[in-house]
A protein has these predicted regions:
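Short beta-alpha connecting loops at secondary-structure transitions
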Residues: 55-59, 103-109, 119, 123, ...
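Short, small-residue alpha-helix embedded
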Residues: 57, 111-142
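Charged C-terminal helix
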Residues: 147-177
Length: 177
C-alpha cells in the first residue's frame, strides 16, 4: 500500500475508528515502525503478521532468536495484540505472553505473496467468529498445511502463492476430520 502521507493518514484514521480486531501486515507494519504513536491506537487483540525484518523495525534488532522471542512476547503484552512472527517455525504470541510454534510449512513457501495468503486466511477466520488467538493459530497451521500439500503436488522449488491457495480447501477438509 506504500508509506506515503495519504496512506499514513488512512491507517491512522482506521486505527482511530476501528474498535474490532484488525489484521496488519507489510507496509501497515512499516508505517507503525516509522510512526510509533500509532502503535498506541491498535485495537485490543489485533493481529500483526511481520516477517523478521518488519518485526525488527518495530522493536529493534535482537542478538539472537531467544531475545527476539522475548521482545515478541513483550510487544504482545504491552499493546494487547497477537504477533505472528513469520519464519521457518512461525511463532505466535498473545497478550498473556503465551507462545505457540507452528509445525507445518516448508521452505518453498518463502515466495512472493505467501504472506498475503496467510493474512487473508487469518482475516477470514476472524470474520467467521474465531477469536484473534484462535484465528492466528489455526490460520498459520492451515497456511502451512496447504503449503505442505502444495509441495507434495508440485514440489517446493518454484512454488507460488496460488499453489498454496489452491490447496487451502483440502487443508481445511483435513482439519475438519
Amino acid at each position: 500500500i506504500g508509506k506515503n502521507k495519504n496512506t499514513v493518514n488512512a491507517l491512522a484514521n482506521l486505527l482511530n475508528e476501528c474498535k474490532g480486531t484488525t489484521v496488519l501486515d507489510a507496509d501497515a507494519l512499516n508505517i507503525l515502525s516509522e510512526n510509533r504513536e500509532l502503535i498506541q491506537l491498535l485495537p485490543e487483540n489485533s493481529i500483526l503478521t511481520p516477517h523478521p525484518k518488519e518485526f525488527s523495525r518495530l522493536v529493534g534488532n535482537s542478538a539472537n532468536d531467544f531475545e527476539r522471542l522475548e521482545k515478541q512476547k513483550q510487544f504482545s503484552a504491552d499493546y494487547d495484540v497477537i504477533v505472528v512472527l513469520k519464519g521457518a517455525h512461525t511463532s505466535i504470541t498473545a497478550p498473556d505472553k503465551s507462545v505457540f510454534f507452528n509445525s507445518t510449512g516448508n521452505p518453498g513457501m518463502g515466495t512472493a505473496g505467501s504472506g498475503d495468503v496467510l493474512t487473508g486466511v487469518i482475516t477470514a477466520l476472524v470474520a467467521n467468529g474465531y477469536s484473534s488467538i484462535e484465528a492466528a493459530i489455526i490460520g498459520v497451521y492451515m497456511h502451512g498445511l496447504a503449503g505442505d500439500l502444495a509441495s507434495r503436488q508440485k514440489g517446493q522449488t518454484g512454488m507460488i502463492a496460488s499453489d498454496i491457495i489452491s490447496c487451502l480447501p483440502l487443508a481445511f477438509q483435513k482439519f475438519d476430520k
